Amino acid sequence: MNDLNVYGEKIRNMLLELGIYNKSDDYSPDIKYNKTFHANGYPITGLYKFLGYYDRDNNIANFPSISFTTNFSSCDVTCRVLRSGNDRIIFNGKNNEKYYKRAEKALSFLRKKYRIDAAFEFNIRINRRYRDAKGLGESAAVASATARAVAAAVFGMDAAKDRGFVSYLARHVSGSGTRSAAGNLSMWLSYPGIDDLSSIGFEIRKDDLFHFYAIPMRSRIETLNAHDYASSSIFYNAWVKSKFFDIIDIIENKFNTRMMLEYSMKDMYRLQALLISSGYIIYEKHYLDIIRKLRSSLNNYKNVYFTSDTGTSIVVMSTSMNELSRFVNDLDLDGISGNFPEKIIIEEL
């Protein structure tokens, strides 16, 4: 892992030199007991994805990753801190064991580091623009919205508006939440040996963005622990090293948009091969048929790319709205147009 730390430090220094990244500030608790705070968050689509943790307890990944936030869905969270009692989490109107376990891990970190002795109440609601799908980054939206609401209730509004600090808190809920909290086109800096407050998400830029379209897809196959499967592949270490080299290449090319979109498509194929090599087969016929359809048509379009994650939904991207629309219409794709989200909410109710 020493060489990965060296590559990671090189990337960190490059980002510091560009002036787009800084280690997160830390805050002291100033808890607003019995007051309710509301915040929202948005899902992400991974351009340059991550699988595998260096430090699973603190959700520090083995390498950096790049993603962008979308408005395919959104998440609203309310948080209230009580002086005593038990933690309570309501998800879409019901108790949810999955999110309770994830929240308890993050709250355990919060209580230990900041010496907080209190109970937390959360009400979480996902708002979808599609009926049901896997792979459109909903867990990232939950993590970032929850982190914002917690930051407001525990540390105050200044902390809740500090994207670096919110990203830091979100990472302890979900790795993908780190980039959702940063917003727009963002990178999560992570590598073996990185300092805890340094492993955060940050916005790469606000301009020169792109256009995208989602094909939401359900899957009958349960997504198990993809991180463990990926790490068990005999190709994993080579894949990890290639990630660092590609990120360095992307930075040296000033985060060229079309270069990142092209890398994203290549990364999707490598990710699929990596998972299949470890026996993790989640890709169904319907998904593969659409991938073939998209791929066979790309030669007729100079500026269209697509990607997907371990979930089966697919996102088509282009720097040209006209080219993307022509591609979607010509192939008669069934999905939804997306935009970069504009409105972040943090408020006391």
UniProtKB/Swiss-Prot annotation:
Temperature influence on activity is noted as: Optimum temperature is 70 degrees Celsius.
**Pathways per UniProt:** Isoprenoid biosynthesis; isopentenyl diphosphate biosynthesis via mevalonate pathway
Record EC number? 4.1.1.110
Q: Name one GO biological process term.
A: isopentenyl diphosphate biosynthetic process, mevalonate pathway
The first-level EC class reads lyase
Give the pH dependence: Optimum pH is 5-5.5.
Q: Which keywords describe this protein according to UniProt?
A: Isoprene biosynthesis, Lipid biosynthesis, Lipid metabolism, Lyase
Record's catalysed reaction(s): (R)-3,5-bisphosphomevalonate + H(+) = isopentenyl phosphate + phosphate + CO2
Q: A Gene Ontology MF term for this entry?
A: carboxy-lyase activity
Q: What does this protein do?
A: Catalyzes the ATP-independent decarboxylation of (R)-mevalonate 3,5-bisphosphate to isopentenyl phosphate. Functions in an alternative mevalonate pathway, only present in extreme acidophiles of the Thermoplasmatales order, which passes through mevalonate 3-phosphate rather than mevalonate 5-phosphate. Shows no detectable decarboxylase activity on mevalonate, mevalonate 3-phosphate, mevalonate 5-phosphate or mevalonate 5-pyrophosphate.
Q: Misc remark for this entry?
A: It is proposed that Thermoplasmatales adapted the classical archaeal mevalonate pathway by replacing mevalonate 5-phosphate decarboxylase (MMD) with two specialized enzymes (mevalonate-3-phosphate 5-kinase and mevalonate 3,5-bisphosphate decarboxylase) in order to produce isoprenoids in extremely acidic environments. It was found that at low pH, the dual function enzyme MMD is unable to carry out the first phosphorylation step, yet retains its ability to perform decarboxylation.
Q: Which NCBIfam families match?
A: mev_decarb
Which family does the record claim for this protein? Belongs to the mevalonate 3,5-bisphosphate decarboxylase family.
Share what the entry says about its subunit structure, partners included. Homodimer.
Name-wise, this protein is: Mevalonate 3,5-bisphosphate decarboxylase
